[in-house]
Amino acid sequence: MQRHMRKIAPLAVLLAFALVAAACGDDGAEPTTAAPGATTAAPAVTVAPTTGGGGATTEPPMSTEPVAVCELAYYTGEFAPYGSSLTADVVFPIAEVINQDPPLGRPWETYHEDLGTVGEAQAARTCLEQHNAEIVVSIAHGYRTYRDFMLEWWAENDSPIVPSVHGGAIPGNLGGKATEPIFRAQGLDEALGMSGILYADSIGAESVVIFATQVEGFQLAAGAAEKAAEAIGVDVLARIDVPAEQPSYRAEAQRIAELAPDAVIVQAGSVESATLIKQAAEAGLSLDWIGETGWIQPEFIGTLGTDPIASQKGIGFAAFSYNDTTPAWDFYEPLWDTTAGYGDLYGPATDLYHFSTYDVMIQTALAVEYAGSYSATAWAPAMFAVGDPPGTMCYTYAECLALIRAGEDIDYEGITGPGSYTDGGVNAVVQSYTPFNADGSVGEAVVLDAQRALDIIEQIAVEATCDADNQCDW
């Protein structure tokens, strides 16, 4: 079920369920408030909310304790090549925007717990038990292994609040409420697989091979691609599932050559994907390769090189696009691109994880101010309130914050879309396919058919089946 969304653009409305995400480890969990790696004072302590006027929950008026924001980070494991970039994405909106005038007067202090070695469940526990995190960033594809622990923690503490950039493997009907306050910036992984098939069909591909590494989010997206292909009428010649982080995929490239598909749908990390394509090109193949959002990371082209691009029919990724026509983008883009330690190290503002992380963190902070509290009970409904009409439309953190403090309702219009979320806490984004140019640069995004995407995602979306005690299977 979809919450009401304003009609700033018909495409955004149609894409309420057509959501895209990539599935996505501790180098020492030092607190940071500036560039990644900087240290500050001791971690914040959790402050119990009180009830203010009008029934809103508010923090104690004299509280200036820092708020511990703990990122579930990727410094080891399959996603290690871009772990530092993902951390910069979290630090940027906090250091450069939010902490200039933090919500409720409490500065945010960041910690980064590597999940690549110890696992996501242990990293999340460390955030809560050692750092007293009031905000945990990016619960992700390992959530099912510790959901019971989190539900108990939320029930006992009414905390933490959870904006997530990598939560697309979590079913769309989980989240978005005080008892499970997860809000996802980029959508659902099954829509990513579907989008790849939609693009393949749009270029006339009648047959595909689906290649996926054995990571939950990639497996989910690959399964969705199979279902979407069946719904559309595209023939899946084979699905090839392989372990992640292998030094070579030459045998798989040879099998793809023997199958001779019109296109290959790839659900794998940037390095594995580039290795496969490079080895396929060396074997003489020329195909359309349709990947996932991680390909935007520099490691993809760094591993692939530019020579294979010219030899292939097409190389690009199905993802989502940004809205560069609003004041929100006019503020964000130059700030990212010109601030040392961000654009100069991790690529331009147009890279997907940069702008999607920025948007969800800004909306998180605005919802805290609007709620008057860091409690999940107050924050979860506030995430809807600050992004949905009615309210004064606003585009930047400072502008929106001033309106909230003046007692006005706001309607935040961000850079990923209208700021609206489904009842399950999934952001509405605009699906697209983005090609690579011959020099390795990113080309112009192709927006996919919104109505067709909506029809298909309703057929293939994964939902959790839950009992009366909120024990869920998926």
Model-derived features: where do they sit?
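Extracytoplasmic "Venus flytrap"
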Residues: E59-V91, E113-V118, H141, F211-Q219, ...
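Segments of small-molecule ligand-sensing domains
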Residues: Y342-D351, A367-A445
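Bacterial lipoprotein signal-peptidase II cleavage site
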Residues: G25-T33
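Beta-alpha junction/loop-to-helix N-cap segments that form part of ligand/metal-binding clefts
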Residues: D26, P66, P81-D89, E96-G176, ...
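Extracytoplasmic ligand/sensor domains, especially the bilobed periplasmic-binding protein
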Residues: N132-A244, D288-I315
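Extracellular/periplasmic periplasmic-binding protein-like sensory domains
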Residues: A280-M361, V368-Y374, A453
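Hydrophobic alpha-helical segments within soluble ligand-binding/sensing domains
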Residues: E120, R184-V209, L220, S248-R250, ...
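C-terminal motif of bacterial Sec signal peptides marking the signal peptidase cleavage site
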Residues: V20-A23
